């Protein structure tokens, strides 16, 4: 078998619809658009959500809420995650990234108090919850907000 002998399987490729090529083609004269009316016209389609002049559903619903453009989102790290580090080591945003605990930095890193800390660490993050700070200090470590 040679490259020029290859053919696609029978019925796997459909011929394109050639419209406006005589009445015997089945798609002549009106080209499959029906008779008169908006959809028979050139560019005659309505926009998304248009309901024929009736008040659209999305406009009958009340407007609610807004997006705060100044919102800061922090990558979250829990106390459980910090048990990966060796006793007495320093935990920074960079070391958290290296160990895969933080995927993307966003506006910084926040330490939350979920779980139990079993090692003594020096933690340097952007934000800390009160419970997390208490737990780190109870384990003999220190917390520094950068």
From Swiss-Prot:
Residues 1-13 have a biased composition (Basic and acidic residues). It comes from the Bacteria. NCBIfam families: rplO_bact. One of its GO terms (molecular function) is structural constituent of ribosome. The keyword Ubl conjugation does not apply. Part of the 50S ribosomal subunit. SUPFAM superfamilies: Ribosomal proteins L15p and L18e (SSF52080). The keyword Ligase does not apply. Residues 23-35 have a biased composition (Gly residues). HAMAP family: Ribosomal_uL15. This is Large ribosomal subunit protein uL15. GO terms for cellular component: cytosolic large ribosomal subunit. Keywords: Ribonucleoprotein, Ribosomal protein, RNA-binding, rRNA-binding. Residues 1-55 are annotated as: Disordered. Binds to the 23S rRNA.
């Amino acid at each position: 078998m040679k490259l020029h002998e290859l053919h696609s399987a029978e019925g796997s490729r459909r011929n394109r619809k050639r419209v406006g090529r005589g009445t015997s083609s089945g798609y002549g004269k009106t080209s499959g658009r029906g008779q008169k009316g908006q959809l028979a016209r050139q560019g005659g389609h309505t926009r998304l959500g248009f309901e024929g002049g009736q008040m659209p559903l999305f406009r009958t619903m009340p407007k609610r809420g807004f997006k705060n453009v100044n919102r800061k989102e922090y990558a979250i790290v829990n106390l459980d995650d910090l048990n990966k580090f060796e006793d007495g080591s320093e935990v920074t945003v960079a070391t958290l990234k290296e160990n895969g605990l933080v995927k993307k930095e966003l506006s910084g890193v926040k330490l939350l108090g979920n779980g139990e800390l079993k090692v003594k660490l020096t933690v340097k993050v952007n934000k800390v919850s009160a419970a997390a700070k208490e737990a780190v200090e109870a384990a003999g470590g220190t917390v520094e907000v950068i």
